[in-house]
Design a protein with these regions (language model features):
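Cytoplasmic helix-loop-helix junction between adjacent transmembrane helices
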Residues: 104-142, 328, 334
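Extracytoplasmic gate region of multi-pass secondary transporters
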Residues: 28-32, 214-268
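Residue-level signature of mid-helix packing/kink "hotspots" within the transmembrane helices
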Residues: 26, 54-62, 148-149, 260-268, ...
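Helix-to-loop junctions at the C-terminal end of transmembrane segments
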Residues: 60-72, 267-279, 364-365
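Hydrophobic core of transmembrane alpha-helices in multi-pass small-molecule transporters
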Residues: 99-115, 225, 306-320
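C-terminal ends and interior cores of transmembrane alpha-helices
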Residues: 82-95, 289-302
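Helix-loop-helix hairpin linking two adjacent transmembrane segments in secondary transporters
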Residues: 140-190
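Extracytoplasmic
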Residues: 9-43, 61-64, 234-239
Length: 404
């Protein structure tokens, strides 16, 4: 089955919004060193602001999802894009830890949560038939990866032309484009095609209560915590890892860009795979692959080639976990409150992200390196691979069955 023109417009708009917002967020790590030099706040304090951003991104998503589930996605996404721009553009003017936390950790990250995956995937999921949701979510997720691939090297290039303050402001302004794109995603849950909605009598509170009583939902949410730990640690501290290996900053920029590029392929592959194999099996395989990739990275000499190869391999798994995770939430608990329920899963992801970003900075200041963070990465990856195995993919409730 192919998407019709309207569905393609919705998918493309969601993918482009995610590309802009995620690209801006991922490029911010390139500015940690100049921000530290300009403010003297210290890597640990700046890492704390980035860690709070991970947490705020997660905290925002269930509430943004609840508003979108009730009133529609368009206004939520548009406001999110504006806040990302506002927080990012004002960041160079933060000269205290608390101001940095407010701008990066609250304003920009809160906006990113409002224009985040929970709201976007819900808008797309309601517009396409159930059997096509895996592919559609893979396309949207690939949009974020393309944003990372495209925006990070542009940010590095602009730094050489405009200086870091001008570059950060220019990159932040890109997120404003999410506002007009949100018009294409303005539909409300009630506008979903017949047969794709949950039973109308089920309330949001009941849907959340039922999900929190479901062991499979808890396993899935716990596994996504690990994904957040991995992604935030790498996104925030890979430039620092490169610098500690006495390699030029361009290696970090291109590594982050390649992670985004190859996650496009990973997202498409994951979206395709969940239409053919059990989603929990795809997730277990992805987490195990991450663990093996980090082990190989630790064993290899730290050269430019090593970082490039690592970026390619880890990029294939980076956000490829999103399509099967979204798919499982929708399959188990239906489409009606997907933005809210996936927002809860994303909150767990971002709690992991908070720890990955914050502990990376603390570990560096305590030991002068990141080795123990990589060891934690490996252990958590294999734990996540195992915790998905007992998940049952049978729809738990009548409303989920009706939606799936």
């Amino acid at each position: 089955m192919r998407f019709d023109r309207r569905q393609w417009w919705i998918i493309a708009a969601a993918a482009l919004v995610f590309a802009l917002v995620f690209g801006v967020r991922q490029s911010q790590a390139l500015f940690i060193s100049p921000l530290n030099s300009a403010t003297g706040l210290g890597i640990a304090s700046i890492s704390l602001a980035f860690a709070v951003a991970q947490l705020m991104w997660g905290i925002t998503q269930p509430f943004a999802g609840a508003v979108a589930d009730r009133y529609g996605s368009g206004r939520v996404i548009a406001l999110g894009g504006v806040l990302v721009t506002l927080g990012t553009v004002l960041t160079p003017h933060a000269h205290s830890t608390w101001m940095l936390i407010l701008l990066i950790g609250v304003v920009a990250a809160g906006g990113a949560g409002m224009a985040g995956l929970g709201v976007l995937m819900s808008a797309v999921g309601r517009a396409v038939p159930p059997q096509q949701r895996g592919l559609a979510s893979g396309i949207v997720n690939a949009g974020g990866s393309f944003g990372q691939f495209a925006v990070v090297p542009v940010a590095q290039l602009l730094t050489g032309i405009l200086g870091w303050v001008g570059a950060l402001s220019a990159v932040g302004a890109m997120a404003l484009a999410a506002a007009p794109l949100a018009w294409l995603l303005r539909g409300r849950p009630e506008a979903a095609p017949a047969g794709q909605r949950a039973a109308p009598e089920k309330s949001m509170r009941a849907a959340v209560r039922d999900a929190m009583r479901d062991p499979s939902f808890i396993y899935l949410t716990t596994g996504f915590f690990v994904c957040g730990f991995h992604v935030a640690f790498i996104a925030t501290h890979l430039p620092g890892v490169v610098a500690s290996c006495q390699l030029p900053p361009e290696v970090a920029a291109w590594s982050l860009s390649l992670i985004g590029l190859f996650n496009i392929a990973g997202s498409f592959t994951a979206g395709w795979a969940i239409g053919r194999w059990r989603m929990k099996s795809v997730l277990s395989l992805l987490y195990a692959a991450r663990g093996l990739a980090v082990i190989a990275f630790l064993a290899a000499p730290k050269t430019t080639s090593t970082f490039i190869v690592f970026a390619v391999v880890i990029g294939f798994t980076y956000l490829a976990t999103v399509p099967p995770t979204v798919g499982l939430v929708a399959k188990l608990h239906g489409m009606r409150f997907l933005a809210t329920l996936f927002g809860i899963v994303m909150l767990s992801h971002q709690i992991g992200g908070f720890l990955g970003a914050w502990l990376g900075g603390k570990m560096f200041e305590a030991t002068g390196g990141y080795e123990w963070m990589w060891y934690a990465d490996v252990m958590l990856a294999f734990a996540a691979a195992l915790i998905h195995l007992p998940i049952s993919e049978a729809p738990r409730f009548r409303s989920a069955a009706a939606a799936a």
